[in-house]
Every structure is written in C-alpha cells, then in structure tokens.
C-alpha cells in the first residue's frame, strides 16, 4: 500500500503518525516546504515503513499530478480548503488516483461535490471532509439516524481551544466560519443564517462545563440532507475559554472578517487577511499567558432527534479530548479506501459512502471512544 500525504503541517503530521503506527508499507509526504517534509520523514521512518519526502506546489497542477503517480490513495491536509480543496481534487481526478481530504469549508465542499461525475468517469473514489468536524461527526449523525424510524433534527456542535496546533489555516477557517452568512437546513430547505447568531449554552461533562456556541460556517448542513431524510440540520461552534469566544465573535461583528479590501492610508487592505495576521501575532506573543495556563479541551457533540416505535427519541454522541484531531480520521479514511473497504466511485462526504460502525471500530483500535446516550419520551 502506497499513500501520498499532502501537507507537512499539524494535521499532516498527525495523519503520518497514524499511518506509520498502522504500518502502511510506503508513504510519501509532500509539501511546498520540502525541508519540513524531510524532517517528518526522518522523525517517523521505521524499519517496517518506507517514508520519503517530496516537493509539491499545490498551485501547479503538473506538480500535484507528478507526486500523486503510483499512489493507492492521496490524503490531502493542504489548507485552507477555500484555496486548495478543488485544485488538489482536480489533480487527483486527472491522475486517476483515489482521494481523501479534510475540507471543512462550505463553498469548497459544494465545488468538490460538483466534480462527482468527473471523478466517477475517472473511476476514482474521493471522500471529502474526512476529518473530525466534518467527518466523524457526520458518521455519528448517520449512525443515530439509522437507529430511528423517522429523523426530525440533527444538531452538530464543535468547541475548540483558542490556541490551535494547526496555526494559520485554522485561524483563517475560524474567521470564515463566524463571518457573514452561513448555511443551515430548515424544514427541508437550505437557508443562510447570520454567522455568530442564535447563541446557545451547552453543558458538557467536566473538564469542559458550560460553553457558548453559535451558528458557524461548516459543510455538514449542506451534505447530510443529501443522504439522510431529515427536516432540520444545524452546525454551531464555540471557542474556549468562553471569554475568548465572546471576544472573537464581537471582533468579527465589526467587519474584521470581511473579504472586500478597504483603503488604509491609500493602501488596499483585506480585513480578513489583517485579522489573521493580527491574531497569529497575538497568539505568538502572549500564547498561553492569554488563557492563564488554563487546560483547554476540545469537545464535539451530535444530537439526532426523531421517532422510534412511535415515541420521541434522541441519540447524543460526545467526543471529548484533544486526541480528537482531523489528521487521525484522514489517515483512517485513506486506509479504508486503499484497502478496498470503500468501492463507490465519485465524490462523497463521509456519510455518503462509509458505514459508521466499521469506522468506529477503527477508532476503538486507536483508543478513541464515542459516548452514546439515548433519551426516550415516556408518558406517565
């Protein structure tokens, strides 16, 4: 089995670590910064696993297709996906190589899904959004829906620490997620709602506790209704500590996430680009001091509501802990495709081609467990 891993950043390293632990025979890690890729290859190489490093320019189709040649599957962690999602998938289609990525932006998700027929004609399997959120959360939604006779509502909730190991791409994604209008699904129709609106306080088990979440720009409301018959799908996100999330939402409400340039002393400046640079500088300078040494924990929840045997029933799935990272799910998805466990051809979100129970078994092997709670309404 040969897997080409694109991106030597935080998510790429996590995916590489899992691939090595799984003893994938041959791994090529490719990045624009070849030195960074070489460092990872050296750090993780073992007797059982052959790892090599290559240069790749994600803005150059020829560079992408060249590095993809001979792979069983390409796993892409190159972000932001608003810029590189479609570019990399088109290269995989041209190279006729199976593909998995962790695209977590709404519009690129639609653009990638629109390549379904091209991927099918190229006889490849492409799974997009195969991370934590989206990704594992989508499969939790599918798993809960399979247990109900009728699905009425699916709520997806994610909460991330203010400081991320993935750096600039994560900052840019968070700004996009809480800026402008974002997709939701209500009463069987796709609608746009204001990002950062409809605050909800969710209580998680300790050490997380109560967290504020808001409508956020994620692909789940766009993909889940295509495969699950449901009336409402929403995705809300939050940032911990709570005060940091509040300030972040307020910050963006002033237009600092906008993409239209404004003049600053006669020089055009894009507010969103300025904000990314400002936040990265702030985190670099004050870092852990900003959160007062507080231990921050990542958490996700999926709630699936409907009816079972005529009774109102809901299933709640929680994932708690900083081990839940997109890179691990990306590696699992890539191995499932490479091993032939997934045979559908075309472009799919995870819920479109993966059986949840099979994926959850892979998570268990890695010590990652999802808690499930069922609530049923009973008449007294």
What are these regions (language model features)?
Residues 3-7:
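Conserved N-terminal Rossmann-fold NAD(P)-binding element of oxidoreductases
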Residues 12-13:
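N-terminal Rossmann-fold NAD(P) dinucleotide-binding loop
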Residues 33-36:
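Helix N-cap at the beta1-alpha1 junction of Rossmann-like dinucleotide-binding domains, i.e.
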Residues 46-60:
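Rossmann-fold cofactor-recognition segment
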Residues 56-71, 77-80:
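Conserved Rossmann-fold cofactor-binding substructure of NAD(P)-dependent oxidoreductases
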Residues 80, 89-109:
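ADP-ribose/adenylate-binding Rossmann-like module
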Residues 102-125:
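Rossmann-fold NAD(P)-binding glycine/threonine-rich loop
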Residues 147-380:
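C-terminal catalytic/substrate-binding lobe primarily of soluble NAD(P)-dependent oxidoreductases
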